């Protein structure tokens, strides 16, 4: 494991460790694209955060954003200022949920052939991104603080609640953004269970 530091725009210093299995993403996103001979415009990340009760953090998108009122994991595009793809993941987690990453565990193999990464376009369909999602440990799961420009609410959902996209408490629907998000979250639960059973 390697310790990482990065100065965040809000002066928060991101400090986290990561498993060797994700060291491939401990490089600038442009360097990753060049090394892997990819022509996508950029990379994006997602953070799967679980609490002590094995529930996952889901954020509800703002009503005036694309895919309004739908639910997703924290994440977003890498910035040119991000020291690495992993730093981009930790920064997005901080900006969207106010949570500090302490450890990045593994990447979710949600792509074709069981490889990590899902390719998608921006709203106009003119820019292409590949999103890598990671399971991330945080300082305190009880301290979620949303950016109201991006998200309006959050829930901690069980695997069963994600499968039916409905919270038991209050019988509230939690429709996920798309089938890709459903797959990422389901795979995150499966990998976590396999690790705990080992």
Predicted regions and their residues:
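Nudix hydrolase/Nudix homology domain
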Residues: 2, 127, 131-133, 137-198
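Conserved beta-strand and immediately adjacent loop positions that scaffold enzyme active sites
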Residues: 46, 55, 153
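Short, ordered coil/turn segments that flank beta-strands lining enzyme active or ligand-binding pockets
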Residues: 52
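Conserved Nudix-box catalytic region and its N-terminal flanking loop in Nudix hydrolases
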Residues: 55-95
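Active-site segment of metal-dependent pyrophosphate-handling enzymes
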Residues: 98-142
């Amino acid at each position: 494991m390697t310790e990482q530091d990065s100065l965040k725009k809000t002066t928060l210093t991101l400090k986290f460790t990561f498993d060797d299995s994700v060291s491939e993403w401990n490089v600038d996103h442009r360097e990753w694209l060049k090394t892997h001979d990819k022509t996508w415009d950029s990379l994006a990340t997602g953070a799967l955060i679980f609490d002590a009760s094995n529930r996952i953090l889901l954020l509800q998108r703002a009503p005036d954003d694309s895919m309004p009122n739908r639910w997703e994991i924290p994440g977003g595009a890498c910035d040119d200022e991000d020291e690495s793809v992993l730093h981009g993941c930790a920064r997005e987690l901080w900006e969207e949920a106010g949570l500090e990453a302490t450890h990045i565990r593994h990447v979710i193999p949600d792509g074709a052939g069981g490889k990590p990464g899902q390719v998608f376009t921006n709203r106009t369909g003119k820019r292409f991104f590949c999103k890598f999602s990671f399971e991330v440990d945080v300082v305190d799961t009880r301290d979620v603080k949303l950016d109201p420009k991006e998200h309006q609410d959050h829930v901690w959902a069980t695997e069963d609640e994600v499968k039916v996209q409905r919270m038991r408490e209050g019988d509230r629907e939690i429709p996920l953004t798309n089938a890709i998000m459903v797959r990422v979250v389901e795979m995150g639960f499966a990998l976590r269970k396999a690790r705990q059973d080992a």
